[in-house]
């Protein structure tokens, strides 16, 4: 269930992007080609991801110009200046990142040190893209519980140091595609938000921006690792299992990778989780005025849009906002950088809602948050938590004659409501299946021939029995639904074969 908030407001947002923007031609000065395949992969990836400019915290010689902690500190300073708040007024700092400049201590403590900030509560959220939302939730909970009046959430990423050509020398400048292509996907940057217990939105002209809820859900028990740093390509050994860092580097255990073959599952679970939020009344697509969606490539826009449309829960494209093309993909920082630029460039009105969605490929996670604009002159609204399902439409099944067999994509409103509920049921069922001993054996490559024969001995009779049940059920159909019998018979035949 999402975590609801009654007294948390976004007061200001800031960002820090190092140096000058780097276009697609200039990239080679920072992320030099590794081998003869590099230029071909680069052209393909850039054509798909739609990124025209990005930022790097290293120079053309590969030297670090800004540390990750300095990036985060820069975003915090920008955020505080925009909010007109002194650092001494903040009593909590939560950070989100895939990794700071040190393995220890925590990233939030390194940022606090970089800022020379006074004593305060700190929390370091370690993850990938959703870590920024995790930092926001932690800061918001501190305010909601009354422990803090002002709290900062910051997310910062600096993957460029992993992409320098020199990093691949130990492997003879050769690497697998899962590691190679990310060099043209990710870049550096930081974003920060200042949360408070009631202050007006900075520059909002008499508006407040209320954080309604945050929802995070991980499916790491269902799926294998998709994006990782620290394991070999086959995921059999970790970097600490080698005799030295040099051995780990030569084995590719220090290369950042993403298994793109698993990505379709990420969008599938993300949309199903969104459908559940709609079904339970946490968000109404018709009420969403601005949709801030984090995606790593513009190639995925039609994928997300198509899945939302099929679920009957689409948000019109004109309401979408992204700055991927000119800010780049900055991982955990992306959604905070996006919020900062959105608030600086858009005019908001009371009653508008801002819905944010962040999928994380690391080991599959989906994060969402909902903001609502209020007039600063009005008393704070205490919204009741959703109860049961959201009412998406007033139409009932009796209002429409459904000509079987029907097309779910063109289903009437009453049926769309049912399909939304069924999507949630399928979502839970699939998760349970993925965690069964049988599927775990397959995932972990422990599924041997005897296991397969045993499975088939149990499964084939069940399928045959199921086909008989389908045909018996089809034989009992009458009236308007009798036309479905032929379709069921075809499906039963396919199952049996």
Where are the predicted features?
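Condensing-enzyme catalytic core mediating Claisen C-C bond formation in acyl metabolism
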Residues: 1-66, 175-265, 359, 370-396
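Short beta-strand segments
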Residues: 11-14, 96, 126, 151-157, ...
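Short acidic, glycine/serine/threonine-rich loops at helix termini
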Residues: 22-24, 104-106, 137, 162-167, ...
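Claisen-condensing/thiolase-fold acyl-transfer catalytic domains that form or cleave C-C bonds
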Residues: 69-73, 99-100, 113, 118, ...
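Short glycine-rich phosphate-binding loop at a beta-alpha junction
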Residues: 88-96, 285-294
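Long, hydrophobic, well-ordered secondary-structure blocks that form the structural core
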Residues: 97-99, 113-114, 126-142, 153, ...
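Non-heme di-metal
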Residues: 398-497
């Amino acid at each position: 269930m999402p975590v609801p908030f009654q007294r948390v407001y976004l007061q200001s947002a800031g960002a820090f992007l190092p140096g000058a923007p780097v276009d697609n031609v200039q990239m080679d000065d920072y992320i030099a080609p590794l081998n003869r395949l590099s230029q071909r992969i680069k052209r393909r990836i850039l054509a798909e991801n739609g990124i025209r400019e990005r930022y790097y915290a290293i120079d053309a010689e590969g030297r670090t110009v800004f540390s990750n902690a300095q990036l985060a500190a820069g975003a915090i300073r920008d955020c505080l200046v925009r909010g007109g708040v002194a650092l001494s007024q903040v009593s909590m700092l939560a950070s989100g990142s895939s990794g700071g400049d040190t393995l220890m201590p925590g990233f939030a403590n390194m940022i606090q040190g970089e800022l020379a900030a006074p004593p305060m509560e700190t929390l370091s959220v370690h993850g990938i893209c959703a870590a920024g939302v995790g930092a926001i939730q932690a800061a918001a909970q501190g305010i909601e519980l009354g422990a803090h009046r002002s709290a900062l959430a910051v997310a910062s990423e600096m993957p460029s140091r992993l992409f320098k050509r020199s990093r691949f020398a130990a492997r003879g400048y050769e690497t697998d595609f899962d590691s190679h292509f990310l060099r043209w996907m990710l870049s550096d940057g930081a974003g920060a938000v200042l949360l408070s217990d009631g202050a007006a939105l900075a520059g909002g002209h008499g508006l407040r921006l209320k954080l309604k809820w945050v929802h995070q859900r991980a499916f790491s028990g269902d799926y294998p690792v998709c994006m990782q740093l620290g394991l070999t390509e086959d995921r059999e050994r970790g970097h600490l299992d080698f005799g030295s860092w040099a051995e780990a580097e030569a084995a590719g255990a220090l290369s950042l990778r993403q298994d793109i073959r698993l990505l379709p599952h990420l969008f599938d679970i993300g949309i199903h989780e969104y459908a559940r939020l709609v079904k339970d009344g946490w968000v109404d697509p018709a009420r969403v005025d601005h949709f801030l969606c984090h995606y790593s490539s513009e190639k995925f826009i039609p994928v997300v849009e198509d899945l939302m449309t099929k679920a009957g829960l689409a948000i019109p494209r004109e309401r979408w906002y992204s700055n991927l093309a000119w800010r780049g993909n900055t991982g955990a920082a992306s959604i905070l950088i996006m919020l900062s630029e959105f608030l600086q460039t858009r005019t908001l009105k009371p009653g508008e809602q801002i819905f944010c969605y962040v999928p994380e490929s690391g080991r599959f996670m989906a994060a969402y948050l909902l903001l609502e604009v209020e007039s600063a002159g009005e008393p704070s609204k205490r919204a009741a938590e959703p109860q049961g399902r959201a009412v998406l439409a007033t139409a009932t099944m009796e209002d429409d004659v459904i000509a079987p067999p029907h097309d779910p994509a063109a289903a009437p409103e009453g049926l769309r409501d049912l399909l939304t509920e069924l999507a949630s049921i399928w979502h839970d069922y699939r998760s349970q299946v993925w965690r069964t001993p049988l599927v775990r054996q397959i995932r972990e490559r422990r599924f041997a021939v005897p296991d397969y024969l045993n499975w088939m001995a149990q499964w084939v009779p069940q399928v045959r029995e199921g086909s008989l049940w389908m045909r018996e059920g089809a034989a009992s159909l009458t009236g308007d639904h009798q036309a479905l019998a032929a379709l069921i018979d075809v499906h039963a035949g396919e199952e049996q074969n």
